[in-house]
Amino acid sequence: MSKSVGVAPHNIVNKSGLHWRDYYEMTKPKVVMLLLLTALVGMCLASETWISWKILLAGLTGIGFLSSAAAVINHVVDRKIDAQMARTSNRPMPKGKVSPQRALVFAGVLTVVGYLILELWVNRLTALLTLASLVGYAFIYTMYLKRATPQNIVIGGLAGAAPPLLGWTAVTNDIHAHALLLVLIIFIWTPPHFWALAIHREKDYARAKIPMLPCTHGIEFTKTSILLYTVLLALISVLPYLIGMTGAIYLLGSSALNAGFLYYAWKLKFASDEHTAMKTFKFSIIHLMVLFVVLLVDHYMRFTF
């Protein structure tokens, strides 16, 4: 049964239902927490010693504020699209709980405060790179790429892959190849992650006229693309060990995680049910989260074969 969706008129806000939880929801806290985990790992891997708690706190707070601001802007720009999709129709803006004007003010405050924290207590490089990531996600991806090309996730994924680099520069004030390798891992992880969701929500995206890969090239083509990207991810994930960046704990952990992701991608390729795509999507989140935890454990408990 299809779920009816709709949007409140843009000039009508349900003030009686206005609540801080609506603003909190617009920051996409679960997504931001995963981003901050990858930023934290970037910080830790950048140093052989314990990180200053001031840099740790200021860095994660500033990156978190700017990431949250990007999420809020995404809510504003996508409010009409969100109203047409069952998955997003209950968000605060389609429901008329928060006006675009108030949301933009909220995003502006988060942006200014986040940038100043990074500029004043971390370093300018991190502040500028984090601001660039906000622009890349909230404006280049959300306003243009998402609506323009089925490769939106591939190109726009770079902004979402940046946090490990931001964490690294927060500690070192320098861009290092090891940090870029962490970015590359997330960059390659992003397409199969989102395409699995896009398969599950293909009708939603088609209704909203968003050119996601399943809508433009078909579900079978998308399944093949997911499998190929997952194979590429498994190969790329070995590089940190091969260049001496990580030890045996990471090699074993990442191999097990990639084997799991490959299992789901292979199963999805030949599945005809409606649930495998969502299972693949959910596992991809676990994959990235645990992969970066394994990186952290390996860094502080290093041993090699």
Curated annotation (Swiss-Prot):
Keyword Cell inner membrane present in the record's keywords: the answer is: yes
Any one GO MF term held by the record is: protoheme IX farnesyltransferase activity
For biological process, the GO terms are:
heme O biosynthetic process
Which CDD domains does this one have? PT_UbiA_Cox10
Q: Which domain of life is it from?
A: Bacteria
Q: Does the keyword Transmembrane apply?
A: yes
Annotated Gene Ontology cellular component terms: plasma membrane
Which compartments does it reside in?
Cell inner membrane
Keywords, ordered alphabetically: Cell inner membrane, Cell membrane, Heme biosynthesis, Membrane, Transferase, Transmembrane, Transmembrane helix
Transmembrane portions of the chain: 31-51, 53-73, 103-123, 125-145, 152-172, 179-199, 231-251, 277-297
Extent of the signal sequence:
none
Q: What is the membrane topology here?
A: Multi-pass membrane protein
Its Enzyme Commission number?
A: 2.5.1.141
Q: In which pathway does it act?
A: Porphyrin-containing compound metabolism; heme O biosynthesis; heme O from protoheme: step 1/1
User: What does it catalyze?
Assistant: heme b + (2E,6E)-farnesyl diphosphate + H2O = Fe(II)-heme o + diphosphate
Q: What does this protein do?
A: Converts heme B (protoheme IX) to heme O by substitution of the vinyl group on carbon 2 of heme B porphyrin ring with a hydroxyethyl farnesyl side group.
Q: Into which family does the record put it?
A: Belongs to the UbiA prenyltransferase family. Protoheme IX farnesyltransferase subfamily.
Q: What else is known?
A: Carbon 2 of the heme B porphyrin ring is defined according to the Fischer nomenclature.
The name of this protein is Protoheme IX farnesyltransferase 2
Give the source species. Pseudoalteromonas atlantica (strain T6c / ATCC BAA-1087)
* Top-level taxonomy: Bacteria, Pseudomonadati, Pseudomonadota, Gammaproteobacteria, Alteromonadales
